[in-house]
């Protein structure tokens, strides 16, 4: 029975197949004439098409099944994705854009999660922007930057947060062209409860900033997506693929961010394509100008266009695929449309002066600090006569007015600048004369014979020096200089000596008051040096008339007494007696006046301290460190002062006194510091008046050859003989090593050893003194960890092994801070700058570890590493261990001061062995531990072989 049913079933199946093929044959015949192939739609494909229809991803099937030649269905697909299946009735042949037959294509189907939509790198940004709105209120705000821009996200609790304000202060007006050249766009998030907000800062090709407010509802989504921690400041740098390239828990300098970006291979292509971009951007003149924009949906894609470009972009996208040049031409033509309204300009112009003023202030600061970093130190030779530094006349009057108080008011009336030629010709005179300064205040007292001889010798030589140079110097010399030794005496001065000795002169020209005219002042100044010079001759001339007057007075007295005795009884001679009495009184007055003039001069105060007296108080007792500096704020002096103040105890055990002379040669002040032990009696060598005595200071300068206005330092032994000259600041360790070789010091050390005198640093070292030890001399690499068993800390230590030479040549000092709570400590590792592998280690006390962590705001709870430059500023933060020091070396070698060091080291042949990086260094780092650095690291190999060490 079953075998009979088999043929019937086969017959029915064959008939069904024939009928089915007959119904489709007309469609096949009609399509065969046109040469068009009809896609076979299977039940499986129809199901997938239905699935795509629901998910909105049916672009691949729709292309192969569209019917109309016009782009009308293409527009409909933008709004509502529709799936069209093949119909047997009407099939006109579709053509491409230029009449080319369209080839069907099938696209892979994937799930469209929110995270994959952000990282979708297969489809173009244009298609992605059609599917998702990308305005500042859209949840897909990051999608507008994908493939075109790098995104710099700054997250802070609120706008007044300290780190946020510090980071924004680093964003000066002149940095936005650099940011635009690297295709960087900014997103600022404020996430504190109740103050959620933010803004999107788009940087145009002209450096202009277009700010759009950010929807507060997007803040939590962006925070969770970027894994940003609430309540703390943090920054994230995203690649063009929207992958995280670097995280920064603290503000960093833009150079560190540029360094990270410039390491990528795509950045090299950008540099080639954008040559001269920064110059053109800055030439536009609108760099740093902020334009406030509203919240628009289509404003997300125009990353570097103007506001008009962003608003006009969606209508353009509904058309056929544009070429690369078309949007740019339209952008330039449409950018002028939002310009006519004056309101944006009125709102954006007021902030501009504020920002420029801030930038100017910061520049002044940097220029003032820069000479310390780029000072080319002079050679060790001492050209005594040629090193005459010019000094400004306008800076002298205030200091001179303080020192020479008697002449201050009158001298200040004669302020006039010297001509440049005259000033240059007078420099040798100005540096030679102060050494011969005499006490011009001794016109009321008779000075010792030694001073008479010196002043007479000065006057004797000046009589024959009335040449062109002396005339010029007398007419144009700085009026604030000490008048005594500087004014040469003219040949007519001896004729004025009688006038100088008279009482009328002293009455008219009171030294405590200023004179009425400039001519009288010059006459008074000229008379003072000649007075001291001629005192001996004056006294001799005075003695002769005094003796004659005395003889006449005695004879007159005798005659008058005889007459009074003989004619006492005669009344007619009373008138004669009265006349004689009057004559007696007159004679007595003249005798008293003549006798009082020399005695008054002898009763004047004693002369001021001389150089011999000053040095005599130090001889055999103290060693001297004499320093001259133009001003107290001089950078070289500040370095040297900080250096010896840190070694107080060592200075005291070596019995060193520091004599510091401030100011120019002709107007200086002095300060003396004695470093003594506790059991020594405090020393007081000079009075306060002697510290501003120009004669004493000039003689001290002359004694040790410190006769020019520059930093200079002299070291003496206890015999006060010069042992060493220094023209630049020097480390006190080398000074102490030199002193310990003195014979007198060897005896002192033996004596101190017997008495048990040792250096005990009982004072707690302050943070300022600790950091000033490294300023402009060393770079600090600070590593902080909760304990020495921390995994990140141990990984970082393994990366530091074998890097002593590189650290030394780059002047790096490692500071390790360990511990939490009260159990904290630290170690300071000093590497020699010559590249040797010897490391000096010093313990850091607990209180200093806490101060350093507080100063740099480093948490003791987790690992952290930061690089501090020679200027004391933090250059970069590293929240995770650096398995290779390449990034740190690249950052340091890009600094200007480091380039100067490299040039010096190259000339000296200082370099590190090439095999130092074997195992993990430059050549193996490109296998890397991070996806962002796996691109290409050949530039590290070129760095290794290209630099001289």
From Swiss-Prot:
Compositional bias ranges of the Basic residues kind: 487-498
Subcellular location: Secreted, Extracellular space, Extracellular matrix
UniProt key word Ubl conjugation: yes
Glycyl lysine isopeptide (Lys-Gly) (interchain with G-Cter in SUMO2) cross-link, chain position(s): 544, 547
InterPro entries, alphabetized: DUF4174 (IPR025232)
Composition skew (Polar residues), residue ranges: 436-445
GO biological process: extracellular matrix organization; positive regulation of cell-substrate adhesion; response to bacterium
A Pfam family this chain is assigned to: DUF4174
Gene Ontology molecular function, alphabetical: fibronectin binding; glycosaminoglycan binding; heparin binding
Gly residues bias (residue ranges): 295-307
Composition bias, Low complexity: 345-380
Chain intervals with Basic and acidic residues compositional bias: 112-123, 308-328, 419-429, 463-477, 499-510, 534-548, 556-581
Coiled-coil regions, chain positions: 554-587
Keywords recorded for this protein, A-Z: Coiled coil, Extracellular matrix, Glycoprotein, Isopeptide bond, Phosphoprotein, Secreted, Signal, Ubl conjugation
PTM annotation: Phosphorylated.
Region (Disordered): 24-79, 112-132, 289-610
Tissue occurrence: Expressed in brain, stomach, colon, rectum, liver, lung, kidney, adipocytes and testis.
Assigned GO CC terms: basement membrane; extracellular matrix; extracellular region; interstitial matrix
Stimuli inducing this protein: Up-regulated in adipose tissue of obese BRS-3-deficient mice.
Sites where a glycan is attached: 467
Signal peptide region: 1-22
UniProt subunit comment: Binds to various extracellular matrix proteins.
Family: Belongs to the CCDC80 family.
Function: Promotes cell adhesion and matrix assembly.
Protein name (database record): Coiled-coil domain-containing protein 80
Species per Swiss-Prot/TrEMBL record: Mus musculus (Mouse)
